Amino acid sequence: MSEATKFTPILLGSDMNVYGMARGFYEAYGIKSIAYASDQLAPTRYSKIVEVRLVHDFHDDPVFIETMRKLQKEVFNDPEEKYLLVACGDGYAELLAKHKEELSEHFLFAANDYDLFKKLSNKVSFYETCEEYQLPYPKTMIITKDMVQDGKLDRALPFDFPVALKPANSVEWLDIHFEGRKKAFIIDNLT
């Protein structure tokens, strides 16, 4: 790698997305990535191409921004090097958007403005935006608590089965835990 392309990939998280990004950087540039995360997840546990550094509650503020400020001052401070931040998950993407102005002074990364991120990451306002700009999107029905009576939907679906059931807010969904929890559920019929 030439001096002109000297950079350090800093990946946020420790899941399969992080491993995939680290592999891409390693294959393209021959460099090892650094990752910061709250927990050590299996996909990166024994990897030789990414060094995972754990910080308790790193996925939450104020720990995230306080840690990034400290890293900027104490670790990632070589003026000859570029520091590339990559959010490998919705929660970290939200944190980068929230702190975009401050972090962009020292790190390189892509992030929406926070208000736009919030608008587009919530399925209700996302589909409203699609309608506003006449953008196509899959047939959708937003189900609210008052539409469910005795555990059953009180109206007919506007489309046939199978259907995908997803949370309206993928970032908030990360903090909800129960047996059988998934990113999306495929429902084949009414029973």
Regions found by a protein language model. Give the residues of each.
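ATP-binding N-terminal substructure of ATP-dependent carboxylate-amine bond-forming enzymes
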Residues: 1-112, 146-150
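Pocket-edge positions in alpha/beta enzyme catalytic cores
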Residues: 56-60, 118, 185
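Glycine-rich phosphate-binding/catalytic subdomain of phosphoryl-transfer
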Residues: 79, 98, 106, 117, ...
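A short, structured active-site edge motif that brings together acidic residues
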Residues: 111-121
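Active-site nucleotide/adenylate-binding loops and adjacent lid/helix of ATP-dependent enzymes
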Residues: 119-191
